[in-house]
């Protein structure tokens, strides 16, 4: 590297840094130094005890090539069509544009060492960690020639997940839970089934104390920008605590200090350092650490443009960059210098990429790289392999019933605390029921009253449908990323999630229809009698649950909330048209007849009208106008609409639709999790 490049980097660093590195190095009372040198780490006693790890893992990888699809923007409808094509069509033979993200990367992480992956934004740090943790996103492909080994034994995703904890950069939580409730759920499904619930709760208390979460343990996590809750630093510590519950032998952390102040960043890295000293293998990415934090790293891996620019100790890094003519200036933070040397400078892209290519080429043929290759061959030749026991070979830590119980508990608490699901919906239901009741108040048994009652009954169905579909889409799509991550981490099965969530939300979907019918039914003056009331209540309750199931299906088939909200109404309208109000059931075209059997509007509207008019005898309906058709009895009113008196058939139809939509939603979510694996 030329003198001009070095001067340019130094000037850039001076512009970005308000306080000189020299003053930081000469001031022993800096925040990071105080965190490291003080007794702060003593509060982590139980988490970082001196006990040796049960299993020590050397993680090595070689010839790692990662390719990603080039994103092609499109509308929500186009994305939905592509998803449907992906489900029913074999896309393997359709060539897609790809980008080479990680290029022939090799490396090794030893037990007892803290390996820090550094590089500028876009260097490939997160992509590398996702590949190492077998958590690559959809559309990202790992080359078949890539080798990933633990103790010289090639591993797959299941073996890695049994031994590795992965703290990802973005924190995903159920925002309505408290920090303690979240950790209780995580401990229940993460920790071995041989442990009692009391032991798991003791571990939760221990981790809460270790990571300084005592003050915020009963604070709701919240949703950034929507519901106030934990701070960014507290959320990051909570994510770390979730993974620390099981005390894993291999820990991979993507930007664990992101969003933390300097004191907490230093404390978190100190904890990771202590974990590595216990014999654990720790890999983390970090963006431009302070000089104090940089000294904690046993090894550093510098990434640039998807390639390895250096892998070795900090001392070896100084020698390497000095050898290639890029010596770090005196009193300059080495981490800042390396990142800036390997960054693509705006306006100097060609020159920067040429410099990066030369650095990576020099490392590939250098002494450190050759020694690493020899060590890799020695590791691959080992025969000790991996320990095999029940805890590492079992797919899920918790039993099926434990998973189901934990999910049902979490879903029930979340439902009670979610304002959109409880308070707002109850108020909305009451207001709409009162409004409809006032508009159609005490309808008389006349030909006009018959028309009004029929319209009011159909309003029951449209209100229940759209209220539940949109409520589910708004809440469930926000929870889907959490579901996807937790199922990929093998915390629970897809079927236990769906069953537990369904049963937890069932009381709400029983209360809302009851509240609505209890208000609107008597105000309108519908057919009196407890039997008629309960029949109407049963039908409206089933409609609420069918529409909820349909909302689950849309949510599971959509990639985002905006997409689900865009496609939800157009998909609902066809079912509404077959309800018998806009189109007589006897006039449905033959080619659409099959679709009418999936319309819950049809079954419910027919059932409610049969319940209302089937036993109305001739003479009960008063004809007050000679200019309009007047049904002489309830049977005539039903025949006009082409309805048959088969009430139980409508009930069975709605129950069947609930099962169909729930199963379809489960299959959609299951296929998404399969594609992610």
UniProtKB/Swiss-Prot annotation:
ATP binds at residues 119-126. Keywords: ATP-binding, Membrane, Nucleotide-binding, Pigment, Transmembrane, Transmembrane helix, Transport. It is a multi-pass membrane protein. Its main location: membrane. GO terms for cellular component: cytoplasmic vesicle membrane; plasma membrane. This is Protein white. Belongs to the ABC transporter superfamily. ABCG family. Eye pigment precursor importer (TC 3.A.1.204) subfamily. Residues 82-330 form the ABC transporter domain. The keyword Transcription regulation does not apply. PROSITE patterns: ABC_TRANSPORTER_1 (PS00211), ABC_TRANSPORTER_2 (PS50893). The keyword Membrane applies. It is found in: Membrane. It comes from the Eukaryota. Disulfide bonds: none annotated.
């Amino acid at each position: 590297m030329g003198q001009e490049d070095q001067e340019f980097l130094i000037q850039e660093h001076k512009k970005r840094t308000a306080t000189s590195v020299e003053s930081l190095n000469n001031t022993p009372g800096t925040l990071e130094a105080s965190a490291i040198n003080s007794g702060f780490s003593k509060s982590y006693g139980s988490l970082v005890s001196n006990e040796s790890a049960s299993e020590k893992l050397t993680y090595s990888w070689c010839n790692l090539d990662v390719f990603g699809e080039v994103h092609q923007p499109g509308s929500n409808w186009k994305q939905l069509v592509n998803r449907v094509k992906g489900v029913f069509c074999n896309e393997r033979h359709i060539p897609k544009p790809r980008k080479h993200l990680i290029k022939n990367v090799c490396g090794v992480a030893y037990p007892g060492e803290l390996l820090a992956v550094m590089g500028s934004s876009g260097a490939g740090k997160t992509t590398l960690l996702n590949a190492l943790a077998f958590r690559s996103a959809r559309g990202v492909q790992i080359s078949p020639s890539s080798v990933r080994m633990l103790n010289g034994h090639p591993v797959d995703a299941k073996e890695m997940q049994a031994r590795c904890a992965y703290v990802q950069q973005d924190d995903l939580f159920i925002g309505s839970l408290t920090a303690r409730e979240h950790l209780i759920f995580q401990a229940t499904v993460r920790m071995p089934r041989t442990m009692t619930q009391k032991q798991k709760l003791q571990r939760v208390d221990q981790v809460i104390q270790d990571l300084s979460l005592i003050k915020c343990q009963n604070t709701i996590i919240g949703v950034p920008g929507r519901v106030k809750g934990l701070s960014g630093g507290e959320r990051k510590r909570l994510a770390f605590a979730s993974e620390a519950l099981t005390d894993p032998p291999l820990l991979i952390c993507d930007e664990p200090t992101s969003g933390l102040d300097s004191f907490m960043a230093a404390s978190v890295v100190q904890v990771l350092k202590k974990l590595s000293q216990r014999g654990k293998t720790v890999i983390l990415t970090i963006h431009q650490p302070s000089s104090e934090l940089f000294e904690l790293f046993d090894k550093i891996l510098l990434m640039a443009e998807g390639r390895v620019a250096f892998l070795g100790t900090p001392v070896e890094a100084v020698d390497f960059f000095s050898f290639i003519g890029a010596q770090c200036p005196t009193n300059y933070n080495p981490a800042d210098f390396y990142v800036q040397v390997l960054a693509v400078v705006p306006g100097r892209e060609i020159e920067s990429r040429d410099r990066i290519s030369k650095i990576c080429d020099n490392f590939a043929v250098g002494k450190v790289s050759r020694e690493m290759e020899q060590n890799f061959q020695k590791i691959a030749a080992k025969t000790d392999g991996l320990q095999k026991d029940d805890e590492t070979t079992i797919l899920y830590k918790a039993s099926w019933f434990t998973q189901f119980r934990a999910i049902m508990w979490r879903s029930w608490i979340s439902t009670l605390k979610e304002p959109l699901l409880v308070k707002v919906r109850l108020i909305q239901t009451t207001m709409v029921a009162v409004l409809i009741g006032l508009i159609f108040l005490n309808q008389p048994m006349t030909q006009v009253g018959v028309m009004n009652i029929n319209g009011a009954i159909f309003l029951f169905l449209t209100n229940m449908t759209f209220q539940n579909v949109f409520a589910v889409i708004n809440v469930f799509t926000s929870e889907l990323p959490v579901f996807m991550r937790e199922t990929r981490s093998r915390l629970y099965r897809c079927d236990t999630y769906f069953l537990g969530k369904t049963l937890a939300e069932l009381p709400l979907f029983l209360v809302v229809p009851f509240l609505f019918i209890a208000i609107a039914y008597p105000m309108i003056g519908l057919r009196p009698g407890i039997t008629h009331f309960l029949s109407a209540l049963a039908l409206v309750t089933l409609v609420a649950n069918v529409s909820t199931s349909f909302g689950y299906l849309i949510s599971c088939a959509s990639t985002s909330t905006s997409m689900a909200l865009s496609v939800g109404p157009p998909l609902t309208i066809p079912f509404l048209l077959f309800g018998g109000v806009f189109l007589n059931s006897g006039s449905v075209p033959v080619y659409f007849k099959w679709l009418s059997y999936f319309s819950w509007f049809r079954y419910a509207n027919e059932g409610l009208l049969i319940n209302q008019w089937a036993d109305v005898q001739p003479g009960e309906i008063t004809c007050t106008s000679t200019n309009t058709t007047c049904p002489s009895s309830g049977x005539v009113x039903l025949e006009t609409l082409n309805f048959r008196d088969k009430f139980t058939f409508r009930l069975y139809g709605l129950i069947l639709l609930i099962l169909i939509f729930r199963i379809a939603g489960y299959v959609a979510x299951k296929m998404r999790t399969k594609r992610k694996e």
